[in-house]
């Protein structure tokens, strides 16, 4: 269990926290955390009545985060956390989406209609939804659905004591770089995230905007709120992602087999 608390001097001029906080803001907010606080909660303080999921009243934050990592992700150690983040930054649910999109886009008009005719109730709306999202996002797919969750993983990992603050930020760097290189604003990135979430959850979005969903409304609320609007600074997309001096996701991964 790491005991190093947030030290700005420990990460030099890195701006990775400025990427991490908005990337993880929705789940931080939904789980009664503070979107401005890296790790969701202040270590040592009980998680106050979130009423959702594994986050329970009077549960020490590190226990809540460890249970979430274990129950939802099968992560029970530092090694598993680092391996999962490094892997999913490159190959997450977007791989499954692209595979499905490739299948449906490769069909003739008659083949597509035959697929719909043979599909069950859910697939009858998921195939058109997959096709529409593929046309909308192209090669980007549902990338932000994967990248944003990496922010939550490293923050939970920090809070759980599996990573130090500098290590958590360094582990997120590849995801932040991919985000910056692929999108140009938080609205665009969050629309992609929301599309990805609804695709993964197999929600029927026929005739509905992602901004009308509970998560879409949550993002708009965070962005419009005076308390949290500054998190979503589009100027970040015009700046370089500044790494943590002397640390990287690659070095953390390599150290596991050293």
Region locations from a protein language model:
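Acidic carboxylate diad motif detector
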Residues: 13-19
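N-terminal interaction modules that seed assembly of large macromolecular complexes
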Residues: 43-63
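Amphipathic alpha-helical packing elements
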Residues: 140-181
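Accessory, usually C-terminal, subdomains that scaffold auxiliary metal cofactors
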Residues: 179-252
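Serine-biased, low-complexity intrinsically disordered segments, primarily in secretory-pathway proteins
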Residues: 253-257
